[in-house]
């Protein structure tokens, strides 16, 4: 468990917002954490520094300087160190941090400085286990984005994904940057399409562990699990509604695959499409009023949008012969999907009215796009570099970075709400 202690300082928010609003990236130095007592721990130093640098680089707002020790290893509070060496190294902003060890527990303190003016902009202190150093750093990164943009970052979130690292397709969980991987399922079968509940405590997923492709709901903190949809045929591509009360999914209990909505306990079922075509992969709009989905009602797979009660469907994608895997931005302004190109799939982003279609990827075959909870980043799977791995990128397609390292067919990522 990670605890946020009372904030020590939060100053000059207006100044940081104005500075960060420019297109130019800010030169940022990240000083390695220093010990304030209880001994030294090289893992804390390395993990916190690496996490901060990764977060700030992905944010797209900073250029990370290779000047980690420009100012030596002096203190972190105002007046305890000299900003001049950092200024000489070209830093505009500086993150300083320290830790206080007490056995397996630690208190970490982070501070953000404007090197040019000498002002401290932000300070936070966290308490947790030594192994939580990365999470503490991610929490501070979230606060930096909050200070810049008035919205917290998504860096404390997790990514659930499917991997064959055990030999079968099982569900795993990892930090969004690929660290702290843990296995969620261990049934030796095929498990697919994880999706987080809005509060992040539960996931739903499809499993063939009983022979049929049934939908399950699992509590990530207690491991309690319930089978919520086991109709004959497929029970696949489940997605939580934004309020957590319903789940949209595809069922083939009456023949072809159609879109349904069920209550989260599986007791109430409502059919939403009735076309006789194959229709799967529902994706809710953030207000819960609409659903994007895949349909071949016109002969080839395309993305459609309908009201959440199934009424007034319209075709979203009009280019490409094979478009799949819609994902609606939490901001409501874009929908991701995958289009088949020569050589594989590529991820596109389009407005809900079908305009401004942008191709975001080009290297390898790229699938399963999902948004971060703030809508500023995307996670997806890609075959670039051999095998299939999980990547993250910014919403405009820049900053594409590999985060999973198993090399064992990692796919179907989904980014959790903030933990």
Predicted features, each with a name:
Residues 14, 77-143:
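Amphipathic beta-strand/beta-sheet edge segments enriched in Tyr/Trp
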Residues 15-83, 95, 99:
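Short beta-strand->alpha-helix linker/helix-N-cap micro-motif
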Residues 105-107, 167-172, 212-216, 256-260, ...:
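Structural motif
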Residues 153-155, 198-199, 242-243, 286-287, ...:
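Residue-level detector of Asp-centered blade-edge/turn motifs that repeat once per structural unit
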Residues 159, 203, 244-248, 288-292, ...:
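Hydrophobic beta-strand positions that form the internal "hydrophobic ladder"
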Residues 175-192, 218-236, 262-280, 306-322, ...:
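Multi-bladed beta-propeller domains
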């Amino acid at each position: 468990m990670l605890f946020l202690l009372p904030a020590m300082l939060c100053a000059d928010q207006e100044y940081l917002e104005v500075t960060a609003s420019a297109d130019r990236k800010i030169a940022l130095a990240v000083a390695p954490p220093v010990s304030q007592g209880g001994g030294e721990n090289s893992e804390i130093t390395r993990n916190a520094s690496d996490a901060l640098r990764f977060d700030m680089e992905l944010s797209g707002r900073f250029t990370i300087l290779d000047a980690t020790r420009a100012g030596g290893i002096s203190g972190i509070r105002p007046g305890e160190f000299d900003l001049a060496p950092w200024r000489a190294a070209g830093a505009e902003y500086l993150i300083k941090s320290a830790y206080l060890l007490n056995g397996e527990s630690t208190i970490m303190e982070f501070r953000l400085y404007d090197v040019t003016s000498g002002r401290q902009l932000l300070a936070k202190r966290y308490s947790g286990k030594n192994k939580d150093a990365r999470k503490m750093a991610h929490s501070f990164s979230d606060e930096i984005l909050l200070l810049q943009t008035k919205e917290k970052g998504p860096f404390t979130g997790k990514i659930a994904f499917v991997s064959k690292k055990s030999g079968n397709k099982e569900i795993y969980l990892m930090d969004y940057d690929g660290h702290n991987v843990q296995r969620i399922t261990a049934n030796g079968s095929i498990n697919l399409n994880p999706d987080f509940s809005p509060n992040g405590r539960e996931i739903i997923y499809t499993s063939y562990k009983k022979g049929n492709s049934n939908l399950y709901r699992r509590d990530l903190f207690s491991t309690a699990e319930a089978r919520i949809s086991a109709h004959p045929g497929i029970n696949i591509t489940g997605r939580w509604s934004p309020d957590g009360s319903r789940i949209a999914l595809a069922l083939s209990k009456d023949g072809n695959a159609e879109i349904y909505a069920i209550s989260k306990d599986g007791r109430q079922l409502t059919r939403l499409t009735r076309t006789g075509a194959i229709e799967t992969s529902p994706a809710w709009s953030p207000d819960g009023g609409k659903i994007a989905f895949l349909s071949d009602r016109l002969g080839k797979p395309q993305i459609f949008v309908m009201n959440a009660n199934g009424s007034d469907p319209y075709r979203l994608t009009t280019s490409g012969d094979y478009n799949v895997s819609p994902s609606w931005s939490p901001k409501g302004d874009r929908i991701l999907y995958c289009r088949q190109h020569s050589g594989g799939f590529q991820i596109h982003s389009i407005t809900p009215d079908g305009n401004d279609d942008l191709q975001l990827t080009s290297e390898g075959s790229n699938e399963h796009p999902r948004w971060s909870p703030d809508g500023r980043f995307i996670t997806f799977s890609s075959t670039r570099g051999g095998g299939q791995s999980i990547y993250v990128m910014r919403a405009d397609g820049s900053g594409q970075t590999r985060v999973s390292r198993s090399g064992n067919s990692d796919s179907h990522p989904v980014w959790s709400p903030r933990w």
